[in-house]
């Protein structure tokens, strides 16, 4: 699942709590206009799979903060196939391809495997905690 689900995960682990705090900090900066949020059809799709309607509605509210929503096309599929060859799971590959299509500077993920495997792209793939540390003034 994507970072917008992190606040709804079991907060018993320190790492999950830190990532949750980072996600909330990032969302606040988006609301204040300091950052821009890019959304995609993949985020909508994953959210639609969530059986918890309350969480789905919370994430739908986050999607309303996005200035742009990336829709599927052939370029995204081709790009995603390249990521899959690097060992990235199909859904994650589509997320990355959407971010590239949207011209994102950063791709935020709590998945260490994606951070490690998504190389040689014109976008920084980073954990939300590291993003906050790197970008807060």
Provide a role label for each language-model segment:
Residues 42-46, 63-85:
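Acidic catalytic patch
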Residues 1-39, 49-56, 133-137:
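Short, well-structured N-terminal submotif of metal-dependent ribonuclease cores
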């Amino acid at each position: 699942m994507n970072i917008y689900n992190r606040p709804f995960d079991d907060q018993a682990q320190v790492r999950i709590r830190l990532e949750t705090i980072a996600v909330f900090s990032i969302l606040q900066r988006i609301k204040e206009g300091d950052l821009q949020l890019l959304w995609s059809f993949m985020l909508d799709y994953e959210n639609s799979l969530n059986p918890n309607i309350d969480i789905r509605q919370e994430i739908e509210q986050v999607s309303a903060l996005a200035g742009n929503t990336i829709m599927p096309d052939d370029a995204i599929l081709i790009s995603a196939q390249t990521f899959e060859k690097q060992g990235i799971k199909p859904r994650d590959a589509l997320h990355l391809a959407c971010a590239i299509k949207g011209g994102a500077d950063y791709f935020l993920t709590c998945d260490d495997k994606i951070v490690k495997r998504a190389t040689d792209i014109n976008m920084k793939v980073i954990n939300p905690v590291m993003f906050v540390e790197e970008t807060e003034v």
